[in-house]
Amino acid sequence: MKKNLSHIINVMFIPILFVFAIWFVKGYELISENSLSELAIHPWDTEKILNILTFPLIHADFSHLLNNTYPIIILGGIISSVYKEISNRVFLLSYVLSGMVFWGLGGLTPVIGASGVVYALGSFILVSGFIKKQPRLAMLSFLIIFLNFFNLWGIIEIEKDN
């Protein structure tokens, strides 16, 4: 039992560390009663370009946090176990590239949360599943991306006609 737990922690160190970090940040916000929203990405704002490194750590609320926690654990676990040799690089690139995409292509509002990281991890598994001809892996990734899309859709505010 201890050996299995040690193996899981070793294989999933980066996803577990990331999930710990996002929960720690939310805990800090609650305890200190300080919002860290100034660490959001502000598209095309060169003064805040380093927020590419901080925005995935900030979440609006616990629903937002949970909706990113589960996919990171699942997708991170898949990548860590199937792509052991490159998993750390994949996670790091997903983290940084998602920030660059939001900074370069984002709209007019600041962006927070790890959804970009989730989509990047899922996209990596989806594409590599097709390239390696592993349809189960590709379909699992597609399912997680699809389900996460509906979580994202719930965050978007839509004006209703009265």
Name each model feature, range by range.
Residues 2-162:
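A detector for small-residue-rich transmembrane helices and their helix-helix packing motifs
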